[in-house]
């Protein structure tokens, strides 16, 4: 659920609210896109900082800090009446997402039996999918009732849930860890360079990041502005994508263990252009099916 706060609430939920907040705040697509990009840039900077911080602080401390930042960012977004404060909130949420996500797989894996630890990342991905389902369903319903101004109420709801989860996380979650080894450099590049094929991996992950920035950031806007979908229809497509993420994460984790990570990644990257092309047509039923496949690929 912490993954849902850091990613679904603090990052990916922006895409489903994009048309509403753009029209309600009276800003251009360029400005709205800049806000979304600032969120992603903050996440990127956060990953570099976390690689250094985790060599000095315990993982649980880093994850708590991320949850605090994500919650605070959602609070700023919920009270924002102008773009600058909204951008500030999303930048904080982006940083928080990095502080949350990087330690989370280790903490989750340590809580599972040894033969189930490979499912940790998949379960975290399922949490993100669950968060996307919630955000898209809530935003679709509130936008139908309140109109474009509903985006603020959606962020208020997300902030309330994040605050409750922060309290529960602080009270309940525990993680045993020896004192961190100090001396790691900023960004963790020394450790990264020890991995075989680290350059292709970086390129592949960068392409993946670029794809989700474009797809999740403009998914709803593309369907509503260019394909003429109504709010409920675009929200349904976003919801189906989130549902697929819930089941796709553990599914692809198991598949990669059986057939290898390289083959699984190659299959996913090969399917990307096919699925995106179908969505770009805007034809209702095929686009809904493609949204489901897209959710699996994001997993």
For each of these PLM feature ranges, what is it?
Residues 159-180:
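C-terminal membrane-cytosol helix-exit motif in multi-pass small-molecule transporters
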Residues 14-15, 198-239:
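Extracytoplasmic gate region of multi-pass secondary transporters
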Residues 262-299:
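C-terminal transmembrane helical hairpin of 12-TM major facilitator-type secondary transporters
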Residues 46-58, 248-260:
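Helix-to-loop junctions at the C-terminal end of transmembrane segments
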Residues 26, 58, 79-84, 228, ...:
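Helix-breaking motifs and short loop linkers at transmembrane-helix boundaries and internal kinks
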Residues 175-201:
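Juxtamembrane intracellular "pre-TM" segments in multi-pass secondary transporters
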Residues 73, 84-92, 285-293:
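Paired small-residue
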Residues 91-126:
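Cytoplasmic helix-loop-helix junction between adjacent transmembrane helices
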């Amino acid at each position: 659920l912490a993954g849902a706060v850091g990613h679904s609430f603090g990052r990916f939920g922006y895409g489903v609210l994009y048309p509403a907040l753009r029209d309600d705040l009276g800003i251009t697509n360029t400005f709205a896109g800049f806000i979304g990009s600032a969120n992603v840039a903050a996440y990127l900077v956060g990953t570099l900082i976390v690689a250094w911080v985790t060599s000095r602080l315990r993982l649980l401390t880093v994850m708590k800090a991320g949850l605090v930042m994500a919650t605070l960012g959602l609070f700023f977004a919920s009270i924002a009446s102008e773009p600058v404060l909204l951008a500030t909130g999303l930048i904080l949420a982006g940083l928080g997402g990095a502080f949350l996500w990087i330690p989370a797989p280790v903490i989750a894996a340590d809580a599972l039996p040894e033969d189930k630890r490979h499912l940790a990342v998949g379960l975290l991905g399922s949490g993100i999918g669950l968060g996307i389902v919630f955000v898209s369903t809530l935003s679709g319903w509130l936008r139908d009732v309140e109109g474009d101004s509903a985006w603020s109420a959606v962020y208020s709801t997300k902030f309330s849930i994040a605050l409750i989860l922060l309290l529960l996380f602080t009270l309940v979650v525990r993680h045993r860890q020896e004192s961190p080894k100090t001396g790691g450099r900023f960004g963790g590049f020394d450790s990264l360079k020890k991995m075989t094929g680290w350059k292709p991996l970086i390129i592949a992950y960068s392409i993946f990041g670029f794809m989700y920035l474009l797809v999740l950031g403009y998914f709803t806007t593309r369907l509503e502005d260019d394909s003429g979908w109504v709010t409920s229809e675009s929200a349904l497509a976003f919801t189906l994508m989130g549902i697929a993420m819930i089941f796709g994460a553990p599914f692809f984790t198991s598949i990669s263990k059986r057939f290898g990570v390289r083959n699984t990644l190659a299959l996913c990257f090969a399917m990307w252009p096919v699925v995106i092309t179908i969505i770009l047509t805007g034809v209702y039923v095929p686009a809904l099916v493609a949204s489901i496949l897209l959710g699996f690929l994001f997993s």
